[in-house]
A protein has these predicted regions:
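C-terminal motif of bacterial Sec signal peptides marking the signal peptidase cleavage site
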Residues: 15-17
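Structured loop/turn residues at beta-strand edges in well-structured enzyme cores
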Residues: 13, 121, 205, 248, ...
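Sec-dependent signal peptide recognition
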Residues: 2-10
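Intrinsically disordered, low-complexity segments of exported/surface proteins
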Residues: 19-26, 612, 633
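Terminal regions of secretory-pathway proteins
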Residues: 605, 609-692
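Solvent-exposed loop/linker segments at secondary-structure transitions
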Residues: 30, 35-38, 43-53, 83, ...
Length: 692
């Protein structure tokens, strides 16, 4: 179905009837009438429609909107009055997403596969995430059928799009200063309430929704957004639009905030400023971006609360009840793996609906919610909706690129020193930048030929989204039986197809600070502690763990995890000499990092010397094709970093995919000494011997 209208920036009325009975005039609603409502949330779907891994060409029952659909159906059966909302990052994140946006872009007459499914599931509304901007404003305008009123951004006509309102409150055009999407919408729902005498009555409830994205989109997608849009702070935007929503008749106001929780003092530039929306007069807060579970999961054997959430002040955040300064809040993880549910009770008092806060219940419900063991079945109606797109993606994914590998490239132990899935990325980036400089006719660029070129890349798929979320390319490869690489593999090695390669010119002091920031991923280990210690307490920001490399392994460094963050990097050398503060380096990286993504000191866009039109993923693909074959000796064993050797009294563990101790043995990672039991998230606990 095509969305043939541009919604008013003031308010949108979306009528959804839950009863054939005539709606009663609000004035006729008896005092004390009770209305029970469940707000349902998905977030960070990232085009994970089916329970399928396009990189590994295998089923993955831990994810997929087709199973979330089963959770939605169950929640609707339990709660007759529901509002289904999404918190953004829908269109990008799998090969299916890249196929529909880049390899074979969906036409105006078509509709994105994920939007087709969301339409079928009858979503009531959605926010916008930072990854919605990855493919550019013209593509986003087309697939949402929205006129942004920005010069040079023009959709080709009335295009296939979601059937529900999309809202974004804090992104405006630089010329118009008006929101490019509707800043809010009012969804008029007809629900069944209970009068004081116990009888039923049909009532109308106006649910107002607003959407927010991190201001950092201006850094992360600068190439698409610079000079076209600007981003306002989430709190300032909410303070503008909450009163408008109330004045337009919103009974409930829900913030769809594509950001996590940060208890730091508020700043309009905060990436995760959602906590500060709780003081703006909203009634409910739906969270995203961080790919975490909030509140703590309730099913039997539920995963432990992420360390970053557990560290939030209890005076502001109740991680059990799901309250942020008293406002109910939920984050449904990512990839369709959970459904956020906020059950609210409203009482009709003095002519308006009043939330009975003490009766609110919040849950981030997972696939095993019934008994902690049984995974819900997929909704059989979903797969047929996207069968054509699924088959086309598989055909695309399995095309040969003409290169073989004699070794497995995996990220199971990337946080224990393995570089088998990272070195090839760094080699590709160095090769690109050196060739760029060598062939440049720009006199400034040409003058950099004598400066060492190094590279950094992060293990993007290293457990952030659960124990199945690990890069693993060519798992069966051996010297005797090389593995033929396919189109899908560069995306497994470098997940983000939207990143473009950039290079920055830095000093040795900058390099040291960069490495110190990366090393914050590790916990501070107490050698005298007898209790078990996690080497990596949270994988939520694993994309900020940059691993550096130079040709011939000329760059080496050590990490001392017994020291406080900021004081961990020692023995930093290049070509056998200690790196000093004034040394010059050129670092091949991506536009996200070069532009300031991750808040690395001094890396803020001002040191960028090369802005490539080529995506990092494409650079990796081209490099692989040029090699004809890659080998462990040349492309997978250049371990540039190690831990400072430390004897610990108690066990230090690293959580990774189960059953991979043989991988560590093959890699020669002797510090990975044994595989232990599974934790409640399904990760295996590997013992790390820091003395080796």
């Amino acid at each position: 179905m095509k969305n043939l209208y541009r919604l008013s920036p003031l308010a949108v009325l979306v009528l959804a009837s839950c009863s054939s009975n005539q709606t009663v005039d609000p004035n006729a609603i008896p005092e004390g009438t009770i209305l029970k409502v469940a707000l349902l949330e998905t977030t960070d779907l990232h085009q994970n429609i089916l329970s399928y891994d396009y990189y590994g060409l295998k089923a993955d029952t831990s994810l997929g909107l087709e199973r979330t659909a089963t959770l939605i159906k169950a929640a609707r059966a339990e709660n007759p009055n529901t509002v289904l909302l999404d918190d953004g990052d829908v269109i990008q994140g799998t090969l299916l997403g890249d196929y529909q946006a880049v390899a074979a872009p969906v036409t105006c007459s078509g509709t994105l596969a994920v939007h087709k499914v969301m339409n079928a599931l009858k979503y009531d509304g959605a926010g916008i995430g930072n990854h919605e901007f990855n493919y550019g404003l013209t593509f986003l305008s087309q697939i949402t059928n929205t006129d942004f009123a920005i010069t040079g951004v023009q959709k080709p006509g009335a295009c296939g799009a979601p059937n529900f309102p999309l809202v974004l409150s804090n992104v405006v055009g630089v010329t118009s200063l008006k929101p490019i999407f509707n800043p809010y919408a009012i969804i008029a729902k007809q629900f069944s309430a209970t009068k004081p005498d116990g009888s039923s009555i049909d009532v109308k409830l106006n649910v107002g929704i607003m959407g927010f994205v991190p201001p950092q989109i201006m850094d992360w997608d600068q190439k698409h957004l610079a000079g076209k849009v600007m981003v306002n702070g989430v709190q300032e935007s909410a303070n503008t639009y909450v009163p408008e929503l109330r004045s337009k008749g919103a009974d409930l106001v829900v913030a769809l905030s594509h950001g996590g929780l940060d208890a730091s003092a508020y700043s309009p530039k905060m990436e995760n400023g959602s906590l500060h929306l709780s003081t703006t007069g909203i009634d409910a807060l739906m969270l995203g971006h961080a790919h975490l579970i909030f509140p703590k999961a309730k099913e039997i054997g539920a995963p432990a609360l992420d360390a970053s959430l557990a560290a939030l002040p209890a005076s502001q955040v109740d991680t059990v009840k799901g309250l942020v300064n008293g406002v109910p809040a939920v984050m449904a993880q990512s990839w369709g793996r959970r459904l956020g549910i906020i059950q609210m009770v409203l009482k009709y008092q003095a002519g308006k609906w009043v939330v009975q806060k003490e009766l609110t219940n919040v849950e981030a419900r997972g696939f095993k919610y019934k008994d902690g063991t049984t995974i819900v079945d997929a909704d059989a109606s979903i797969a047929p909706l996207v069968d054509t797109e699924h088959k086309a993606t598989l055909n695309y994914a399995t095309q040969a690129i003409g290169t073989t590998s004699d070794f497995e490239m995996s990220a199971y132990f990337a946080l224990a020193g393995d570089v088998s899935a990272i070195q090839i990325v760094n080699q590709a980036q160095i090769d690109y930048v050196k060739n760029f400089i060598a062939s440049s006719t720009d006199t400034t660029i040409a003058s950099y030929k004598t400066i060492p070129v190094i590279s950094c890349s992060a293990p993007f798929k290293a457990g952030r989204n659960g124990p199945t979320d690990f890069t693993d390319v060519a798992p069966t490869a051996t010297v005797a039986n090389p593995f033929g690489l396919q189109v899908r593999h560069p995306g497994d090695l470098y997940l983000y197809g939207n990143n473009n390669l950039q290079a920055v010119k830095i000093k040795g002091a900058d390099l040291k600070n960069w490495l110190e920031t990366s090393a914050k991923q590790f916990a501070k280990i107490d050698p005298a502690a007898s209790a078990e210690q996690d080497l990596v307490p949270s994988y939520s920001t694993i994309y900020n763990y940059d691993v550096f490399f130079a040709e011939n392994n000329a760059l080496t460094y050590q990490i001392d995890v017994t020291q406080a963050a900021g004081s961990r990097i020692v023995n930093l050398t290049y070509a056998g000499k200690a790196v000093v503060a004034t040394d010059d380096f050129i670092v091949a990286t991506n536009d996200y990092r070069a532009g300031g993504g991750g808040n690395f000191p001094g890396i803020d866009g001002s040191k960028t010397i090369i802005k490539s039109p080529d995506a990092n993923q494409a650079v990796v693909s081209s490099f692989l094709k040029k090699q004809a074959k890659i080998t462990a000796a040349t492309n997978g064993t250049g371990q540039s970093w190690s831990f400072v050797k430390t004897i610990t009294q108690g066990p230090v563990i690293l959580r990774s995919a189960p059953g991979k101790i043989a991988v560590a043995r093959t890699l020669g990672l002797h510090r990975v000494s044994s595989e232990g039991s599974l934790d409640t998230s399904g990760f295996a606990k590997y013992t790390i011997d820091l003395s080796k």
